[in-house]
């Protein structure tokens, strides 16, 4: 009985986020709505969410954002690497396939290459 309720709740949340995102004119910011419940891009965000702050993520060493506790899997995967747009695009399509043992689940979007490109452009913007 709990599973149908949980699935229904998730569907309602996704529908609400989708409706909210439709009012956002920037396609990258709209694509980021898939991410904002776990991540922030605000430079002065002090509250630690369930995912690291993504402000300045492109070009940053993987698993290096101060104040966030990364999984051992992510630390191992990221050793000596930096986030590139290509790596991020690949990672968000299936995090657990790319980094077995990561805590991050597969997000419901961005769903297609155009949305992913818009998201990456959004993440590149200085704040």
Regions found by a protein language model. Give the residues of each.
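Electrostatic cytochrome c docking/interface patches
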Residues: 15-32, 42-50
């Amino acid at each position: 009985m709990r599973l149908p309720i949980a699935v229904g709740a998730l569907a309602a949340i996704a529908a609400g986020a989708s409706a909210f995102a439709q009012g956002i004119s920037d396609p990258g910011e709209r694509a980021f709505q898939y991410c904002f419940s776990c991540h922030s891009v605000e430079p002065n965000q002090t509250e630690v969410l369930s995912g690291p702050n993504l402000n300045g993520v492109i070009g940053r060493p993987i698993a290096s954002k101060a104040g966030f506790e990364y999984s051992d899997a992510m630390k191992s995967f990221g050793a000596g690497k930096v986030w590139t747009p290509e790596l991020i695009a690949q990672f968000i399509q299936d995090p657990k396939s790319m980094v077995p043992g990561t805590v991050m689940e597969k997000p419901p979007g961005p769903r297609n290459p155009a949305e992913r490109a818009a998201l990456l452009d959004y993440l590149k913007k200085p704040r």
